[in-house]
Amino acid sequence: MATKTLSENINQAISDLNSVKQALIDKGVEIPSGTKTSEYGAKIGEIQSGGVTGLDTSNETSFYYFCSSNRLIDQIEKINTSNGTDFSFMFYYSKLLTTVPQLNTSKGTTFASMFYDCSALTTVPQLNTSSGTNFGNMFRGCTSLTAIPQLDTSNGTMFSGMFRDCTSLKTDPKINTSKGTDLSYLFYDCAFKTIEQLDTSSCTNLSYAFYSCSLLETLPEMDLSKVTNYTDTFRSCSKLQKVPEIFNAKGTSINLNNTFQSCSKLTEVKIGNVGTNPLNNTFRGCSELVTVEIGSFTTVSSTFMGCSKLENFIPTGEITFSNSFDVSYCPNLTVESLVNILTAFKDRSGGSSAKITLGSTNLAKLTAEQKQIAIDKNYTLA
């Protein structure tokens, strides 16, 4: 056999390395640009059993990150998912994925982040999700999705961020959330105008659920008796005109920070006892708000900032002073409302004095006798 020249040996080595690289790619292993040939050996360990062609995943239970970052997306139909229980992050960050073939997900229990950040995805199949319990962030960041097929989520408990940032989603997916305890960020920044049904009877966390749903106009009646966290729930729902009487939580304290901030079309709100938590920015920027009925709460200065049309303030519980209380932003408060406020404040006799800021316009509406209500409880008025 003739001895090869140095040049021929080098060319053969290059050819062999290219063959190894192509074989790895054919087996579904990513070889990013700039990967050193010395790293190819380690890459061999990433090959799925049997490779992509004829891939035997019939006994696989976890498809965690299986097709993430566009991996294998052109061969999804060859993947046997019949025994899969964990589909979390399966297609995570597959920004080239536009559609998904029918998958057998009948045994799936977790679908968390399955399609997270699949920004080009336009359709999803009718998945069997009847055994699913975790749907957190399932479609988060799917900005091209306009509709979702009816999914069986009757056993789901975690729905946090399921449709978060689905900015093109225009129709209510009508999911069953009867067992859901965490619905936070559920419809964050979605594009539909109405929600026809939402079972919140088991929910404790509704924070950010409808944040920035700027087209949302109506909500269904909801049982929120177990909810304690309403942080930013309806913030920036700029077309929402009315919310049902939903704040009937039986706990000692509920969080209402920023709950209705910038709900610029909201006209009326009825809330039960808040407890010891302050109302930080709760109604800030609610420029059309006319009536507020609220139970016991703790004050902060920013609660009613920008509520220039507020007329009726109906406290049904005791107001506890903390730091400050300022309704000077609300020059249209009725005399009855102003008296209601002064009457509801907790008596500070024997303690340090505190200042209630009503504003000059509101102060001018009160008689000396009415102002005395606050003075007798160790408050000054400004």
Q: For each of these PLM feature ranges, what is it?
A:
Residues 1-65:
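Surface-exposed receptor/substrate recognition regions of extracellular proteins
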Residues 363-382:
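Extracellular/surface-exposed low-complexity segments
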Residues 50-60, 70-85, 95-109, 119-133, ...:
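Structural signature of tandem-repeat unit edges
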